[in-house]
A protein has these predicted regions:
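Non-heme Fe(II)/2-oxoglutarate
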Residues: 1-37, 147-148
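Catalytic core of non-heme Fe(II) oxygenases with the double-stranded beta-helix
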Residues: 25-147
Length: 148
């Protein structure tokens, strides 16, 4: 059984680092378009698990967590999405289905967890996570700050 794993992908070999930087640029463009402000990745890593390994509810550091679902052959019936919970951790507020090329963004202090995959799933549930803070040097920050 494979347990949760985390890999700091910004410290990976050059080719991987180049691809991750391209992915980050695309992720940040979506963040700018949807939230009106640029972010900086504080941490980035790949996370993966298989059937029988469940994520625990937790909160993240930083301002925003962005989770990218990279598996093109993922079947949504295998589940394995991400759930967000109320502040007391009792009720599920939102469930994001695992879907290829989806980006799920939410405030980092929100209680969340990776959901289990079904027994018939023989694939590795893999996500790429960016933990982000506001980019106070980016031109979008001043307008964002003044609008708050």
């Amino acid at each position: 059984m494979l347990a949760f794993s985390a890999l700091n992908i910004f410290n990976s070999p050059i080719k991987v680092r180049s691809n991750i930087k391209k992915l980050w640029f695309a992720v940040n463009q979506v963040m700018i378009e949807s939230m009106g402000v640029s972010f900086l990745p504080v941490r980035a890593y790949a996370n993966a698990h298989t059937y029988g390994v469940n994520g625990l509810p937790h909160i993240d550091d930083g301002k925003i967590t962005a989770i990218y679902y990279p598996s093109p052959d993922w079947d949504p019936v295998w589940e394995g999405g991400t759930a967000l919970y109320t502040e007391d951790g009792v009720d599920c507020l939102r469930y994001c289905t695992y879907k290829f090329n989806r980006l799920f963004m939410f405030p980092a202090p929100t209680i969340h967890r990776a959901m289990p995959v079904t027994r018939d799933c023989t694939r590795l549930r893999t996500v790429i996570v960016f933990k982000c803070n506001l980019d106070t040097e980016h031109p979008t920050y001043e307008k964002f700050y003044n609008d708050q």
